[in-house]
Amino acid sequence: TLRADAARMLVELAGDNMGLFTQELEKLAAYVGKQQQISVDDVRTLVGGWRAEQTWAMTGALRDGNLPAALVCLDKLLTAGEAPLKIVGGISYVFRKLAHATELARRGGRLNTALIEAGVHNRELPQWERYLRRLSRRRAEQLYSWLLEIDGGLKGNSRLPERLQLEHLLVRLSGRTAK
């Protein structure tokens, strides 16, 4: 069985290429064997490889307030030929959950509970809760719009170079103010 969160990650990593999606799903099925479920960790390990690890390192660096490390990860991904939209897919996979949790908390829920409901893993709850508090509610409420803006920008709605658009997104997500 493919867990819902693992399926979402697989879609983000494989993109809209059904042939690649099917190939990766078959590879995962063989990898897990008789296990009952295919997990996010299985997808990250088998499908994502080095590029996925760089993406998770980048989002972790943003979470921890380490913008320079996040920019180094971005540079490695771009230098390796990773497509900017694919990089944004990995970033969006993480930050859409945080945007959803922010909306749930805005409606009166506790942030910790909202993060769980949004799909953040229990072992990462304290770090992401600290991140959102550092970011501020006002900026956290802009997460969805930032993700939409970069998606449109990379699809031709911006004159800025792709790298600059990605770097600007990382600055925003880090909680720093772009000058």
Regions found by a protein language model. Give the residues of each.
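Non-catalytic interfacial helical region
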Residues: 1-59, 151-161, 165-179
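C-terminal capping/gating helix-and-loop segments adjacent to ligand/active sites or protein-protein/ligand interfaces
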Residues: 127-159
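Small-residue-rich helix-loop
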Residues: 35-139, 177-178
